[in-house]
């Protein structure tokens, strides 16, 4: 089963978690908030900030994820791209994501 790491578990982000599960992914959510609804839907939850690149990297590496998604979260987009690049996963180029964040 493929694994996907989703950065954030807020109510808005549960849409992506549910969609990934429906597509057959093992879902892993990381969020620094201890009681977001996504953690109750995901297959696994980590209490880590979605902007902490090193924490995200360690989780993604440990879990052997096939992809990283920052859905409905501008602050998590760049960390997702940086970590995906480091792990050789499909992603938008981190430099492009960084530039797009300068809005």
Per-range role (PLM):
Residues 1-96:
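ATP-binding N-terminal substructure of ATP-dependent carboxylate-amine bond-forming enzymes
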């Amino acid at each position: 089963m493929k694994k996907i790491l989703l950065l954030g578990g807020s109510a808005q982000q549960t849409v992506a978690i549910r969609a990934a599960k429906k597509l057959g992914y093992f879902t892993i959510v990381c969020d620094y908030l201890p009681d977001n609804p996504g953690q109750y839907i995901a297959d696994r939850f980590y209490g880590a900030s979605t902007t902490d690149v090193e924490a995200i990297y360690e989780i993604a590496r440990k879990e052997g994820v096939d992809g990283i998604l920052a859905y409905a979260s501008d602050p998590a987009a760049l960390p997702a791209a940086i970590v995906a690049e480091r792990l050789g996963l499909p992603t938008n180029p981190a430099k492009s994501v960084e530039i797009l964040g300068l809005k």
